[in-house]
Protein backbone atom coordinates (compact mmCIF):
# COMPACT_ATOMS: atom_id res chain seq x y z
CA UNK A 1 0.00 0.00 0.00
CA UNK A 2 1.25 3.47 -0.87
CA UNK A 3 2.20 5.69 2.02
CA UNK A 4 1.58 8.86 0.01
CA UNK A 5 -1.02 9.38 -2.68
CA UNK A 6 -0.73 11.27 -5.92
CA UNK A 7 -3.32 13.75 -4.56
CA UNK A 8 -1.16 14.38 -1.49
CA UNK A 9 1.83 15.07 -3.73
CA UNK A 10 -0.29 17.49 -5.78
CA UNK A 11 -1.37 19.20 -2.55
CA UNK A 12 2.23 19.51 -1.37
CA UNK A 13 3.22 20.89 -4.77
CA UNK A 14 0.49 23.53 -4.54
CA UNK A 15 1.63 24.50 -1.03
CA UNK A 16 5.19 24.85 -2.32
CA UNK A 17 3.89 26.73 -5.35
CA UNK A 18 5.39 24.17 -7.72
CA UNK A 19 3.79 23.66 -11.11
CA UNK A 20 4.12 19.93 -11.76
CA UNK A 21 2.99 18.04 -14.83
CA UNK A 22 0.93 14.87 -14.55
CA UNK A 23 4.03 12.83 -15.34
CA UNK A 24 6.02 14.62 -12.62
CA UNK A 25 3.23 14.04 -10.09
CA UNK A 26 3.29 10.31 -10.82
CA UNK A 27 7.08 10.20 -10.69
CA UNK A 28 7.35 12.16 -7.43
CA UNK A 29 4.58 10.11 -5.82
CA UNK A 30 6.57 6.95 -6.53
CA UNK A 31 9.84 8.48 -5.31
CA UNK A 32 8.31 9.84 -2.11
CA UNK A 33 6.60 6.53 -1.46
CA UNK A 34 9.96 4.74 -1.78
CA UNK A 35 11.57 7.23 0.61
CA UNK A 36 8.78 6.83 3.16
CA UNK A 37 9.04 3.04 2.87
CA UNK A 38 12.75 3.22 3.68
CA UNK A 39 12.08 5.52 6.64
CA UNK A 40 9.45 3.07 7.92
CA UNK A 41 11.97 0.23 7.69
CA UNK A 42 14.50 2.25 9.68
CA UNK A 43 11.87 3.14 12.28
CA UNK A 44 11.04 -0.56 12.65
CA UNK A 45 14.58 -1.43 13.78
CA UNK A 46 14.68 -2.53 17.43
CA UNK A 47 17.06 -0.17 19.20
CA UNK A 48 16.21 -1.25 22.71
CA UNK A 49 19.35 -1.02 24.82
CA UNK A 50 21.25 1.08 22.28
CA UNK A 51 22.48 4.29 23.82
CA UNK A 52 21.68 7.41 21.82
CA UNK A 53 24.67 9.27 20.46
CA UNK A 54 25.20 12.30 18.29
CA UNK A 55 28.68 11.22 17.18
CA UNK A 56 29.99 7.66 17.30
CA UNK A 57 33.60 8.81 17.01
CA UNK A 58 35.54 9.32 20.21
CA UNK A 59 38.28 11.45 18.63
CA UNK A 60 38.21 14.91 20.17
CA UNK A 61 41.03 16.77 18.49
CA UNK A 62 43.27 15.01 16.01
CA UNK A 63 45.09 18.12 14.81
CA UNK A 64 48.50 19.19 15.94
CA UNK A 65 48.79 22.07 18.40
CA UNK A 66 49.40 25.49 16.90
CA UNK A 67 52.98 26.61 17.21
CA UNK A 68 54.55 29.90 16.23
CA UNK A 69 57.57 29.28 14.03
CA UNK A 70 59.88 31.69 12.25
CA UNK A 71 58.84 32.53 8.71
CA UNK A 72 59.61 35.03 5.98
CA UNK A 73 58.50 38.62 6.36
CA UNK A 74 56.17 40.22 3.86
CA UNK A 75 59.09 42.20 2.45
CA UNK A 76 61.22 39.06 1.98
CA UNK A 77 58.42 37.33 0.11
CA UNK A 78 57.59 40.30 -2.09
CA UNK A 79 61.27 40.80 -2.93
CA UNK A 80 61.14 37.38 -4.64
CA UNK A 81 58.00 38.21 -6.64
CA UNK A 82 58.26 39.34 -10.28
CA UNK A 83 56.10 42.38 -9.46
CA UNK A 84 54.50 43.86 -6.35
CA UNK A 85 52.28 46.89 -5.78
CA UNK A 86 51.28 48.37 -2.41
CA UNK A 87 52.53 45.36 -0.46
CA UNK A 88 50.72 42.79 -2.63
CA UNK A 89 51.60 40.52 -5.53
CA UNK A 90 50.87 42.14 -8.89
CA UNK A 91 49.45 39.66 -11.40
CA UNK A 92 47.99 40.02 -14.89
CA UNK A 93 44.27 40.75 -15.01
CA UNK A 94 42.26 37.67 -16.01
CA UNK A 95 38.72 39.05 -15.86
CA UNK A 96 37.35 41.83 -18.02
CA UNK A 97 36.36 45.25 -16.73
CA UNK A 98 32.68 44.20 -16.73
CA UNK A 99 33.29 41.89 -13.75
UniProtKB/Swiss-Prot annotation:
**Organism for this UniProt entry:** Mycobacterium tuberculosis (strain ATCC 25618 / H37Rv)
Task: Report whether ATP-binding shows up as a keyword of the record.
Answer: yes
Entry-linked HAMAP family: GatC (MF_00122)
One function term, GO molecular function aspect: asparaginyl-tRNA synthase (glutamine-hydrolyzing) activity
Matching Gene3D superfamilies, A to Z?
Glu-tRNAGln amidotransferase C subunit, N-terminal domain
Identify its protein family.
Belongs to the GatC family.
This molecule's function is given as:
Allows the formation of correctly charged Asn-tRNA(Asn) or Gln-tRNA(Gln) through the transamidation of misacylated Asp-tRNA(Asn) or Glu-tRNA(Gln) in organisms which lack either or both of asparaginyl-tRNA or glutaminyl-tRNA synthetases. The reaction takes place in the presence of glutamine and ATP through an activated phospho-Asp-tRNA(Asn) or phospho-Glu-tRNA(Gln).
Which reaction is recorded as catalysed by this protein? L-glutamyl-tRNA(Gln) + L-glutamine + ATP + H2O = L-glutaminyl-tRNA(Gln) + L-glutamate + ADP + phosphate + H(+); L-aspartyl-tRNA(Asn) + L-glutamine + ATP + H2O = L-asparaginyl-tRNA(Asn) + L-glutamate + ADP + phosphate + 2 H(+)
Q: Name one GO cellular component term.
A: peptidoglycan-based cell wall
Has keyword ATP-binding? yes
Q: Which InterPro entries match?
A: Asp/Glu-ADT_sf_sub_c (IPR036113), GatC (IPR003837)
Question: What is the protein name for this chain?
Answer: Glutamyl-tRNA(Gln) amidotransferase subunit C
The superkingdom listed in its UniProt entry is: Bacteria
Q: What is its EC number?
A: 6.3.5.-
GO BP annotations of the record are: glutaminyl-tRNAGln biosynthesis via transamidation; regulation of translational fidelity; translation
Looking up Pfam families in the UniProt record yields: GatC (PF02686)
Taxonomic lineage is:
Bacteria, Bacillati, Actinomycetota, Actinomycetes, Mycobacteriales
Keywords of the record, alphabetical order, are: ATP-binding, Ligase, Nucleotide-binding, Protein biosynthesis
The gene that this protein is the product of is gatC
